[in-house]
Amino acid sequence: MFYIVGIGPGPGYITERAIQILQEVECIFYEDYTGPLDVATLRRYARVEPVKLARRDLEDESGRKIFECLQEGKKAALVTAGDPMLATSHAALITLAKAKGYSVEVVPGVSIICAAFSASCLSIYKLGGVATVTYPRGGVYSVRPYELVEQNLARGLHTLLLLDIRDDGVFMSPRDAAEVLLTLEGRERRGVFTRDRRVVVVSKLGWGGSVLYAPLGEIVQSEMEGPAVFIVPAGLNPVERECIKTFSK
């Protein structure tokens, strides 16, 4: 039996089902390259010592260590922060496990998407899509965040922007993200990410973080730390407008 388990965005968000599985399985693996995973919480409930897997273990080697455990007739769990099938997809592992004849159970966790909207007072019913703000690769900037926000602003829909993770595991800061967005505006010049564009910054959610509603021109000078997400609001209703003011700067 193979489990893919989400334990939420930070300490205290783990579910009863996740705890039950961690206390039953013989092999526990985890990855923390997609989000900050609370290893202390994982160890508190784990029956055995958890083994960390890098991106290459899961992608380049197709989860070889996991399948070695399963081939011995043991139960195995892969643990992630947040919800295991939203911000990152381990669908390839599920497909491979089923092709090999193993049963698979996905255990949902509190996702960053739901948690960020809960923290921000904004309606998730108006979420128009998700994009990622990435560092430039080879001097090339991804325009996907710009294009999606532009479309959603025209439709009165909110946009959730996830922030990049560097190859060395460092999470993009809100300041760096704001700088990327302002650079995109300088290139595209369609008024999407002007310095006075106000966004919601949800920083270090689940780790004693904070929520801020401020213009990009101020965020680019801030000292807020990652991991974080941005929500670009549009078409605020009266309830959203009043509530979001409590996070204003």
From Swiss-Prot:
Record EC number: 2.1.1.98
Q: Which reaction does it catalyse?
A: 2-[(3S)-amino-3-carboxypropyl]-L-histidyl-[translation elongation factor 2] + 3 S-adenosyl-L-methionine = diphthine-[translation elongation factor 2] + 3 S-adenosyl-L-homocysteine + 3 H(+)
| Keywords, sorted A to Z | Methyltransferase, S-adenosyl-L-methionine, Transferase
Database matches in Pfam families? TP_methylase (PF00590)
Q: Where are the transmembrane segments?
A: none
- First-level EC class: transferase
Q: Name one GO molecular function term.
A: diphthine synthase activity
Pathway participation? Protein modification; peptidyl-diphthamide biosynthesis
Q: Which GO terms describe its biological process?
A: methylation; protein histidyl modification to diphthamide
According to the lineage, what is the superkingdom? Archaea
Which residues take part in binding S-adenosyl-L-methionine? 83, 86, 111-112, 163, 205
Any idea what job this protein has?
S-adenosyl-L-methionine-dependent methyltransferase that catalyzes the trimethylation of the amino group of the modified target histidine residue in translation elongation factor 2 (EF-2), to form an intermediate called diphthine. The three successive methylation reactions represent the second step of diphthamide biosynthesis.
Q: How does it assemble?
A: Homodimer.
Q: Which protein family is it in?
A: Belongs to the diphthine synthase family.
Q: What is the designated name of this protein?
A: Diphthine synthase
Gene (UniProt): dphB
